[in-house]
A protein has these predicted regions:
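Bacterial N-terminal signal peptides that target proteins for export
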Residues: 1-5
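Intrinsically disordered and other compositionally biased segments
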Residues: 7-10, 24
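C-terminal motif of bacterial Sec signal peptides marking the signal peptidase cleavage site
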Residues: 13-17
Length: 282
């Protein structure tokens, strides 16, 4: 009987010790949680900025250890919709003024018919300018050499063109180019001569993999994907490709967001943007 009691006591002590260890481990994990003083900035940015902003983030976080930057990269139209639907966001960088205007209460009624009021207009700037280019797969097997050649080959049903959807800025620029050459997009699509991507990265991938004979993308994406750009669209063909940026009125960290926007206009950021082909406007 005594032996049985001793065994039970030892077991109880062992279990008690295990419980203590469990609590200590749990408490220890709490100490590794993010610092309460750390600020997380959430930036919604056009997919074409992925490589440059990730590089800038590394530099910025080294200089500002109490700030972490989280990006949401997608088409500007998708990002604009997510902001409308209440997604948490501190800053928006669009690949075209259209989507920014739709969130700017100071924009005219035609540009913002729903009178949406999401961005702080006092922080809005035109940050960058890009170029729209005609890119081809390695070796250019279809021998598409200019936009004019592309237009002629489409009319002759000789090639497959990759372009962005109509709600994507790069797709909207492409639509303007097709109109410039008096091409009927709906007819071409119906004939199976156009393949679409939901953002510029998808279009770029289609060209890189040779799934299309050519594609209309940004100069910076062609550079990042090591694709040959055989022609560059003029302003007459598709207008200027501007990237506006602004802090949101609903930002949880407006001061930190403004500081990051200021950094995007600084020397270190400019060097990163310009080496891939962006033109810095500020």
């Amino acid at each position: 009987m005594i032996t049985g009691l001793i065994i039970l006591s030892v077991l109880a002590c062992m279990l008690g010790g295990c419980a203590t260890v469990s609590v200590n481990v749990h408490n220890g994990s709490d100490t590794t949680a993010p610092d309460a003083d750390n600020t997380e900035l959430i930036v919604f940015a056009a997919a074409s900025m992925t490589e440059t902003l990730e590089e800038i983030k590394t530099v910025y976080e080294q200089k500002n250890p109490n700030v972490s930057v989280t990006f949401n990269f997608d088409s500007s139209g998708t990002l604009k919709t997510q902001i409308e639907e209440g997604a948490e966001c501190d800053m928006f960088i669009s690949a075209a003024p259209k989507q920014m205007n739709q969130l700017d209460i100071t924009a005219d009624k035609e540009a913002n018919p729903d009178e949406l009021d999401y961005i702080d207009p006092d922080t809005r700037i035109d940050l960058l300018e890009n170029k729209v280019v005609l890119a081809v797969p390695e070796g250019n097997p279809a021998n598409v050499t200019t936009f004019a050649v592309m237009a002629g080959d489409l009319l002759e049903q000789k090639i497959l063109l990759a372009m962005g959807n109509e709600d994507v800025p790069v797709g909207q620029y492409t639509q303007k180019i097709l109109k410039f050459y008096d091409l009927d997009e709906a007819k071409l699509a119906g004939e199976g001569l156009i393949t679409y991507g939901s953002n510029v990265k998808e279009v770029t991938t289609q060209v890189s993999e040779g799934a299309a004979d050519c594609g209309v993308i940004y100069s910076t994406d062609a550079y990042s994907a090591h694709l040959k750009a055989v022609d560059t669209a003029t302003e007459d063909m598709c207008g200027r490709v501007l990237y506006p940026a602004a802090v949101l009125k609903g930002s949880a960290h407006p001061d930190e967001a403004k500081a990051f926007l200021e950094f995007l206009q600084g020397k270190e950021s400019r060097e990163i943007f310009e080496k891939v082909g962006f033109t810095c406007l500020k």
